[in-house]
């Protein structure tokens, strides 16, 4: 019998799921449904090389087509493999609901897609600051998750950079450098901040939780990264929350605490113990990027009987699990009648490489790794074959380019209770450093800065035991 698989989500996870279904032997039709109008593309460049592409020469080429969405997409689009040439892509149409018992997806345009098996690959969306002030297009407030987000941010940066040309300064005396504020010092926030700094902007990073990437790196290494970025000219405002935006139609500043004016208090190179102290300040800004994390896109699965606590709860095979209150009919339909798997950022599953606690992993390697496992599971279920339990032990991996630093992370450093600097100097990250992360004496992760690629294999093998 020919079986139809629907994949909800047309990002990297959705694309890899389609490829892996074909590799596993699924010969039936596959339909990929995506909210964005673009074919699958590579997201990491959005905060780095694509964001900066040709903007350094904005004065020389202000009228070029570099900000055209089609041109931007071509630079990051994934090559379509022959194995998925017959896969149907329904793009620009969000999934709005799922009837797992009937095997049917509801789409925003009123159409429906029938399926015998479902892959959930709807990923994440960025969080927004819920504070008063200007909002919407033209407000100077940005997030960065999609290609359209990148194009909007690029256009705003281009306008600011052109305003900062020598000709513009001559026409308007006293014009400051473009002031970019990034709220959030995670990996995306730091990458955007470094990109803006490289374009000649005056950059401040505001982070209530502490030094950059604290949750993953640990305090010592996080402060070392902060010092490195401060030496490059970046300013940090730590331990303080944004409570509003100044400005009417467009942001002119961020309100921090009790409202004191700190326009003259911005001094690059805040103390290593916490950055610039601006409690109660209005921090001037021409443009703001909110990089405060993300949330799983699972609302469309409400009522489907699945456990949607922080993503889609799965077992180690990446089969979606029912919620505790699911009825017997829903449980049967969702778990056995019409098999459902989840991949990528939205999948929460146990990894025996570390422990039996289900977690979501927002790392670059996860869409590919989970797609391989989920496709094998789904194909086996549709064929009535056996699934090997607890055999999925992926090693998380990601990298982050920040100025002259390239960070490589292996394993799950965030699980550690102890961090050791195995080699290198915390005040010379650009010269190379390796930190190892341990939990109860067991190695669970490693982080390297500016390490030669020839060293990556040994770090991976050490974690695999």
Task: Pin down the residues of each PLM region.
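Beta1/beta-strand and adjacent pyrophosphate-binding region of the FAD-binding site
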Residues: 2-11, 174-186
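FAD-binding core/adjacent interface of flavoenzyme oxidoreductases
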Residues: 5, 75-179, 257-263, 267-269, ...
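Flexible, glycine-rich terminal cap/loop adjacent to redox cofactors
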Residues: 8-27, 33-36, 44, 49, ...
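Residue-level detector of alpha-helix initiation sites
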Residues: 11-15, 37, 124-126, 148, ...
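N-terminal Rossmann-like dinucleotide/flavin-binding domain of flavoprotein oxidoreductases
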Residues: 20-112, 218-235
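FAD-site-proximal beta/loop scaffold in flavoenzymes
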Residues: 136-172, 265, 269-270, 274-276, ...
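Rossmann-like dinucleotide-binding cores of NAD(P)H-dependent redox enzymes
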Residues: 168-171, 177-179, 187-244, 394-399
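Mid-to-C-terminal Rossmann-like scaffold of FAD/NAD(P)H-dependent oxidoreductases
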Residues: 348-454
């Amino acid at each position: 019998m020919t079986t139809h698989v629907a994949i909800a989500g047309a990002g990297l996870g959705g694309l890899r799921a389609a490829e892996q279904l074909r590799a596993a032997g699924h010969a039936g039709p596959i339909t990929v449904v995506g909210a964005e109008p673009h074919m699958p593309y590579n997201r990491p460049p959005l905060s780095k090389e694509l964001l900066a592409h040709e903007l350094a020469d904005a004065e020389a080429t202000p009228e070029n087509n570099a900000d055209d969405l089609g041109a931007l997409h071509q630079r990051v689009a994934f090559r379509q493999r022959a194995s998925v040439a017959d896969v149907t892509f329904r793009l620009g149409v969000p999934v709005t609901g799922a009837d797992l018992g009937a095997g049917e997806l509801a789409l925003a345009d009123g159409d429906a897609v029938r399926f015998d098996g479902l892959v959930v690959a709807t990923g994440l969306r960025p969080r927004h600051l819920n504070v008063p002030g200007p909002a919407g297009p033209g407000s100077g407030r940005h997030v960065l998750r999609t290609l359209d987000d990148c194009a909007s941010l690029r256009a705003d940066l281009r306008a600011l950079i052109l305003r900062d040309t020598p000709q513009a300064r001559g026409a308007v005396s006293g014009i400051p450098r473009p002031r970019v504020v990034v709220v959030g010092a995670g990996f995306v926030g730091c990458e955007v901040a470094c990109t803006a700094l490289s374009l000649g902007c005056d950059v401040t990073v505001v982070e209530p939780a502490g030094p950059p990437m604290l949750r993953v790196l640990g305090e010592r290494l996080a402060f070392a990264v902060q010092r490195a970025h401060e030496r490059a000219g970046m300013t940090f405002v730590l331990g303080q929350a944004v409570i509003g935006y100044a400005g009417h139609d467009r942001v002119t500043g961020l309100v921090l605490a009790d409202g004191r004016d700190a326009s003259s208090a911005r001094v690059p190179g805040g103390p290593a113990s916490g950055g610039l102290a601006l409690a109660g300040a209005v921090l001037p800004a021409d443009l703001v990027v909110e990089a405060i994390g993300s949330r799983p896109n699972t609302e469309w699965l409400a009522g489907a009987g699945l456990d949607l606590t922080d993503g889609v709860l799965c077992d180690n095979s990446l089969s979606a699990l029912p919620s505790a209150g699911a009825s017997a009919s829903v449980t049967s339909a969702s778990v056995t009648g019409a098999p459902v798997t989840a991949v990528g950022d939205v999948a929460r599953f146990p990894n025996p490489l570390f422990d039996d606690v289900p977690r979501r992993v927002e790392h670059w390697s996860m869409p590919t790794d989970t797609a391989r496992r989920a496709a094998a599971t789904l194909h086996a279920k549709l064929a009535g074959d056996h699934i090997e339990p607890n055999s999925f032990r992926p090693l998380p991996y990601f990298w982050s380019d920040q100025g002259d630093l390239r960070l490589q992370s292996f394993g799950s450093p965030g699980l550690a209770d102890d961090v050791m600097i195995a080699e290198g100097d915390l005040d010379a990250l650009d010269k190379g450093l390796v930190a190892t992360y341990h939990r109860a004496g067991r190695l669970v992760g490693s982080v390297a800065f500016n390490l030669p690629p020839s060293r990556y294999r040994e770090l991976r093998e050490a974690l695999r035991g």
